[in-house]
């Protein structure tokens, strides 16, 4: 009798668990989702496959692709001989060390960014969204080749590309991008959705966009941009500065566009995303990115101040721009830096003069919506 009682108790518990599972499955529409979408999880419009090119679901993404395609450039437009002369004759040994420290991770930084676009393309399947992502990813290839061209122009050895792994500040930046904490498990995702109705996979995607696009493209790269542009500010390495200015125009467009995609993903799926948890994770990611960048800045400035630019100047700037990225995503700023601490950056970028690749004559880089005020 005692064993029968235990068996009945066990069967009763299983029946209760089964009833709860069935109830949750019905509540979360698991069967309906599977029947219509081939997945137990709710359909995400941004990730839905569409056979035909039109009508567009996201015409703004097509417009961003079109804008981007009106602003092509190539490092081959530039004759780098003046920069070679500056390197050999006008830069101090401390300045050369400073420049090399930045270049050690500069190309790798965009290699890491390109990985983000490869991952985005596997997720977002609407044709106009993919057009935007393809265009942005292709431009990252130009950035990588251009930054590599800077290294080759200065006749630095190929080992330069691996040297970042020897420096903790650089290696930590690289490894953080691919940290496992940005991945959700299949089992965890299933039970969280079954019991509570939120999809951790969507949260991970949103955090990943914030990581790659808002904080790596939009903060970390800008730290290096500013340190390199300080040479151009003083009439040095001007062709390098030209490449940086072109890259800034691109990265600004990429960052703003991807933060808009972030907002679209969250708004369209807010019933399946823990908004408070997402905000906390995005803010935590921003803090970590700034912390890692502080270490990199200290390493770069290990030889001291560089022509009216200090490590504290750059640290203040990245906090300012981090606030701007957070505000664009709809979050409150993290840091007390309200005004741009480096106004010369804005002055330098608002009056660029470039070279037309086909005509080889000066022209303003003022195409489509890349014109106008810079967003910082």
Swiss-Prot record:
Cofactor: Fe cation
Pfam family, one: Ribonuc_red_sm
Species per Swiss-Prot/TrEMBL record: Invertebrate iridescent virus 3
Catalysis performed (reactions): a 2'-deoxyribonucleoside 5'-diphosphate + [thioredoxin]-disulfide + H2O = a ribonucleoside 5'-diphosphate + [thioredoxin]-dithiol
Enzyme kind, highest EC tier: oxidoreductase
Entry-linked CDD domains: RNRR2
InterPro entries, sorted: Ferritin-like_SF, RNR-like, RNR_small, RNR_small_fam
Function field: Ribonucleoside-diphosphate reductase holoenzyme provides the precursors necessary for viral DNA synthesis. Allows virus growth in non-dividing cells. Catalyzes the biosynthesis of deoxyribonucleotides from the corresponding ribonucleotides.
Known EC number: 1.17.4.1
Binding annotation for Fe cation 1: 110, 140, 143
Binding annotation for Fe cation 2: 140, 217, 251, 254
GO biological process: deoxyribonucleotide biosynthetic process
Residue numbers annotated as active site: 147
Alphabetized Gene3D superfamilies for the sequence: Ribonucleotide Reductase, subunit A
Cofactor binding note: Binds 2 iron ions per subunit.
Protein family per UniProt: Belongs to the ribonucleoside diphosphate reductase small chain family.
UniProt keyword annotation of Metal-binding present: yes
GO MF assignments: metal ion binding; ribonucleoside-diphosphate reductase activity, thioredoxin disulfide as acceptor
Quaternary structure (record): Heterotetramer composed of a homodimer of the large subunit (R1) and a homodimer of the small subunit (R2). Larger multisubunit protein complex are also active, composed of (R1)n(R2)n.
Name recorded for this polypeptide: Probable ribonucleoside-diphosphate reductase small subunit 048L
This protein's UniProt keywords: Deoxyribonucleotide synthesis, Iron, Metal-binding, Oxidoreductase
